[in-house]
Amino acid sequence: MRILFISFVFFISCLVIFYRKEYIISDYNINRFIFLILAFVASMALMIIRPNLISILLGWDGLGLISYCLVIYFQNVKSYNAGILTFLSNRVGDVALLICIAWILNYGSWNFIFYLNFVREDFEIIIIGGLVILAAITKRAQIPFSSWLPAAIAAPTPVSALVHSSTLVTAGVYLLIRFNIFFTERKLSQYLLLIAGLTIFISGIGANFEFDLKKIIALSTLRQLGLIIRILSIGFVKIAFFHLLTHALFKALLFICAGVIIHRIKNFQDIRVIGALVNYMPVTITYFNIANLALCGMPFLAGFYSKDLILEIVLLSNINIFRFLLYFVSTGLTVCYSFRLIFYRLRGDFNFFRIHIINDEGYTILKSMSGLIIIRLLGGRILRWLIFPNPIIICMPVIIKLLILITCILGGVIGYIISNVSLYFNNKIKNYNLIRTFLGDIWFIPLIFTCGISIRPLKYRLIIKKRLDMGWKEFFGGQKIYRRIKTSSIIFNILNNNYFKIYFLLFFIWFIVLFIFIIYSNSLKRALHWRCKGDCYNLWIIFIINLLYFYNENVRFYLNYINREINGITPLK
């Protein structure tokens, strides 16, 4: 499992690095961008390979730090805010993982595979499992931490392709796959199932009321992650891993195609005014539509093999009617926003008739997209053979089997209707813009869990800043140190400007001290009963040598000073 997943990470990373050659070719900091991408992939590899919790934490923390650097790569206020939101949201998961590491040390080691036998017996394992779930839902942006994933689209599109497909958001899913026994054996899976169901439903509705191209794809990532967590909480680990790999393929292709479209139309992302692009960029739009159909679960594409299997398992699972309806309505919403995107790409309005150079990108980007589209068409079948060597045969009544197809058809029809009558709703329904903003902004969850939680700490911080940082703390702290340093520097400056006088004064003082010492040496010796046999002559010799030495140094120093200050001649050496 580890080797297969890390091979997908390296494959998609390689295509993303090829993709950046033409996307940000004129960037001055291109080498820094490549270094960040490689460090990002290395952190993900460190997290995947090692089962030790310390190694997982190193890779986990590296993903959070480097993702902040990548999100703020474009130097603007929007990127800064998105980077701070991404970083602080992931910090919650880091704290939970640190507590988990400290707690599991009670068993004697950080390698969790040694303690799987304690899962059914020890109550403390429930606490560790809860901490793992908290860490995972922050990284995979589940409710209530869903606000950072749509905001992270401020990063360059190659970064979004890597983050949403195989690295940052999938890190939380992979952590749950590795620790699945910690919560599947307990009641924690029921809470995880509820969180995943709400995330699927809210993100599906939000994508249908959103007009930002990259944000729609980001919300679809949120929906697919919820789908993976939902099937994982039921207990089907291999199927969750299967869909994780297939999702990585079509999501990388979706973001690369979206980046090509945005790049060619000068960074404009509103889908309402960039329609009918199939006439100008046929290859890119074809690849984009194939990836969208794979997202819907179109038969014989890679997404079909995993999504159809998940739907059949949900139909046979022992769940209540509320969760059943929530799941199938969310599936219809996925098809709805996917067909909405396809409609705008094929038939929508195009308001850039004055831009004459709109075509498919160069050979390098087309090569990256072609590599993904080939794997997209064949990868589902190949992965099914690798992960499930024995075929899975599910028998169910025809009516229940047709329910999946009916849901997808209804979702596509509703998506087509929404695309055609959005202007009608805007004119006829009262407060339509408010409803669209509420549903498109994920039910104001970003506003509640960013501004709503942080507003009071920020107010208290402002009070502390006024009373401490801008009050007595500043007066007796930094400002007082500054005044002391300034006073000392003035004194040293005075000494430095008068160093010749000071040097001569020190020489004179030293001369007086030696003279007094020699005069009173005989009396000191008599008082201390010393015998003077040639000692006085030695003291006189020492005095004469010191006098000559200071005289020589004084003359040389004076000559150097004169040459430097008056004549501009190089000082004597």
PLM region descriptions:
Residues 1-573:
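Core, highly hydrophobic multi-pass alpha-helical transmembrane subunits of bioenergetic inner membranes
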